[in-house]
Design a protein with these regions (language model features):
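Cytoplasmic juxtamembrane regions at transmembrane-helix boundaries
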Residues: 47-69
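Alpha-helical transmembrane segments of multi-pass membrane proteins
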Residues: 1-11
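Hydrophobic cores of alpha-helical transmembrane segments in multi-pass inner/ER membrane proteins
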Residues: 34-47, 99-112, 167-183
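Membrane-proximal helix-loop-helix units in multi-pass membrane proteins
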Residues: 70-125
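Transmembrane alpha-helices of multi-pass eukaryotic membrane proteins
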Residues: 30-38, 61-64, 91-97, 131-134, ...
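Juxtamembrane "helix-exit" motif on the non-cytosolic side of transmembrane helices
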Residues: 53-54, 79-87, 145-156
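Interfacial helix-start motif at the membrane-water boundary
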Residues: 20-42
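Terminal transmembrane helical module of multi-pass membrane proteins
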Residues: 110-184
Length: 184
């Protein structure tokens, strides 16, 4: 829709970095679809984590707190997307990093606990291994890539967008692996 309305250029952002994720859903009329869908996604994340922790018996208070902050940060980010007030800018810039940090850390801790403490012997070890490797890679990659996302790079303007699009794709891949794991 953003391309159709001329809000972003026509390209493959994962490869070309022509637009940020937030720009795709920031402006009317696209934001009338993007924001509600992101809020539904946030609620879906709550149910995902609640059910996944329950099914895999990896229920810990610390992980629950991180997940709570992750989801609240995403909701605040979405609510303030497209707003021009000072506090909105703070939530747009900081909220998304809080969401990413707590999501990736939660994914890592849950994967680590499931992989190394495989108390439920019916758990498929290969899915647990892939989830653990992916979550560890996301955690290490996030630490390495964070300075690139924070500093201004004039000669490579699209690099931040390329990193963001692909990083979020990998975060979603973790959830896909969870689905495949639970399905088996």
């Amino acid at each position: 829709l953003s391309i159709h309305f001329g809000l972003v250029s026509k390209c493959i952002p994962n490869l070309e970095g022509c637009t940020s994720i937030s720009r795709v859903g920031r402006y009317p009329p696209v934001n009338y679809f993007f924001k509600p869908m992101m809020l539904i996604y946030s609620i879906s994340l709550f149910f995902y984590w609640y059910n996944f922790l329950k099914l895999t018996k990896t229920d810990t208070s610390f992980i629950k707190i991180m997940i709570f902050f992750s989801i609240i940060s995403l909701i605040l980010y979405v609510l303030f997307l497209g707003e021009n007030k000072v506090y909105a800018s703070f939530f747009r810039r900081v909220g998304i990093y809080i969401y990413i940090f707590f999501t990736v850390l939660s994914q890592y801790l849950v994967s680590k606990k499931n992989f190394f403490n495989n108390q439920n012997k019916s758990l498929k070890k290969s899915f647990l291994k892939y989830k653990y490797i992916l979550s560890l890679s996301l955690l290490i990659g996030g630490i390495i890539l964070l300075p690139i996302l924070i500093i201004k790079i004039d000669n490579l303007p699209g690099i931040k967008n390329i990193i963001s699009w692909n990083y979020f794709l990998l975060i979603q891949t973790y959830f896909l692996l969870s689905y495949l794991y639970l399905r088996n």
